[in-house]
């Protein structure tokens, strides 16, 4: 059950961080205004909080593993929201990152 909770928290963290960064980008680069920037800043703050809810106690391990989720999530966000079409190298790299997440977070360790 901890693994499912952890995965759900990684997905939530990715939505908050990537979505927050996208909102700031839209506010600044696309001149959509302060409301977009403010919403992005709030989402980014919530991302920081979501990471603390991971069942794993080691900050470094959680953040290292999250890096792989961020890579895959960013490509997925770009495909869904911005119409970006990842090529085979994007997909291969994202899969390698997700394998890394699995090893770092969920490999059996001695107690």
Curated annotation (Swiss-Prot):
GO CC terms: plasma membrane
Stored InterPro entries: UPF0060
Its membrane topology: Multi-pass membrane protein
Source organism of the structure: Kineococcus radiotolerans (strain ATCC BAA-149 / DSM 14245 / SRS30216)
NCBIfam families in UniProt: PRK02237.1
Listed SUPFAM superfamilies: Multidrug resistance efflux transporter EmrE
Annotated family: Belongs to the UPF0060 family.
Protein name per the record: UPF0060 membrane protein Krad_3114
Domain of life of the source: Bacteria
Subcellular location, record wording: Cell membrane
TM stretches of this protein: 7-27, 33-53, 62-82, 88-108
């Amino acid at each position: 059950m901890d693994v499912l909770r952890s995965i759900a928290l990684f997905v939530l963290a990715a939505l908050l961080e990537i979505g927050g960064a996208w909102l700031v980008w839209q506010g600044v680069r696309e001149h959509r205004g302060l409301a977009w920037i403010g919403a992005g800043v709030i989402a980014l703050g919530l991302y920081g909080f979501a990471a603390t809810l991971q069942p794993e106690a080691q900050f470094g391990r959680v953040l290292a593993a999250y890096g792989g989720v961020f890579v895959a999530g960013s490509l997925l966000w770009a495909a869904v929201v911005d119409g970006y079409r990842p090529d085979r190298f994007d997909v291969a790299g994202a899969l390698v990152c997700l394998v890394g997440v699995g090893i770092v977070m969920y490999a059996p360790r001695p107690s």
